[in-house]
From Swiss-Prot:
Substrate binds at M41, G190. Catalyzes the phosphorylation of the hydroxyl group of 4-methyl-5-beta-hydroxyethylthiazole (THZ). Pfam families: HK (PF02110). Belongs to the Thz kinase family. This is Hydroxyethylthiazole kinase. Its cofactor is Mg(2+). It is an enzyme of class 2 (transferase). It comes from Latilactobacillus sakei subsp. sakei (strain 23K). One of its GO terms (molecular function) is hydroxyethylthiazole kinase activity. Transmembrane segments: none annotated. HAMAP family: Thz_kinase. NCBIfam families: PRK09355.1. Pathway: Cofactor biosynthesis; thiamine diphosphate biosynthesis; 4-methyl-5-(2-phosphoethyl)-thiazole from 5-(2-hydroxyethyl)-4-methylthiazole: step 1/1.
């Protein structure tokens, strides 16, 4: 990973404005705060200009939709693009529900986010590829996941983080795989949302290189989860989350570099 981004977060304490999934709002706030960022949750469009002005990045999660949050998302995103602040989007369950597809299409029409983080099914929708999704879960498909991520990145003209047992990060021209992690991520509701929150923290200190920010966020999170699981006598989901927070609080860039299983994928244009 980049040697400096994690340290930069701890030094700069970037403010992250979040429209969060109500199911995981505390998890996202905790993970951002623990690595050194300063999370703010926003729900009223009246505060959008100031919320964006004080922030170094905006994170949008469509996990729990209703009319007011949708209006807030659109208002904040429009303001973030006006103020040239980086935006991260998490298109939760977009592959399964037509209404969510309509909303994400409207959000993406406002401008181009720096990073989109999703599972295989969600990213396949953004790529325009067929995939059998299963609600918020990734589901299954026959298409190579690297191709899914690269196609989505080119179509949306952004950095894609396709998270799963192996994370795939691509801007459509360069692609990286992160093989660290643990199966406990798949049984903990909120793992993806936390990773999205980390992407916002990393891109806040690397707005001109969202691809590297996404790699560093994914690697940090995956290594932390792996270290926790390996240290547990019996890896269990109930005790995994608090220990994950402790690990993220203590982890250093050197720790991540020591354990990272990161490979670059050769891309044929």
């Amino acid at each position: 990973m980049s040697k400096t981004l994690l340290d930069q977060i701890k030094q700069a304490n970037p403010i992250i404005t979040n429209v969060a999934n109500s199911v995981t709002v505390d998890q996202v706030a905790n993970v951002q705060n623990i690595i050194g960022a300063s999370p703010i949750m926003s729900s009223d469009p009246e505060e959008a200009p100031e919320m964006v002005a004080i922030a170094q990045a905006l994170s949008i999660n469509i996990g729990t939709l209703s009319t007011e949050p949708i209006h807030q998302m659109k208002t904040l995103m429009a303001e973030a693009y006006r103020q040239a602040k980086p935006v991260v989007i998490d298109p939760v369950a977009v592959s399964s529900i037509h209404y969510r597809q309509k909303i994400i299409d409207e959000l993406l029409a406002l401008g181009t986010p720096q990073i989109i983080r999703g599972n295989a099914g969600e990213i396949a929708y953004l790529a325009g590829l067929d995939w059998q999704a299963n609600g918020i879960d990734a589901g299954s498909g026959e298409i190579d996941l690297v191709k899914v991520a690269q196609t989505a990145a080119k179509k949306q003209q952004t950095t894609i983080l396709l998270s799963g047992p192996t994370d795939i990060i691509t801007d459509g021209h360069h692609t990286t795989k992160v093989a660290n992690g643990t199966p406990l991520f798949q049984v903990h509701v909120g793992s993806g949302d936390m990773l999205t929150g980390l992407c916002a923290a990393f891109v806040a200190v690397s707005p001109d290189n969202p691809y590297q920010a996404a790699i560093d966020a994914a690697t940090t999170f995956a290594v932390a989860g792996q270290l926790v699981a390996e240290a547990m006598p019996t890896p269990l989901p109930g005790s995994f989350y608090p220990q994950l927070l402790d690990c993220l609080f203590n982890i250093t860039a050197a720790d991540v570099q020591t354990h990272a299983q990161v490979t670059e994928v050769l891309t044929h244009e």
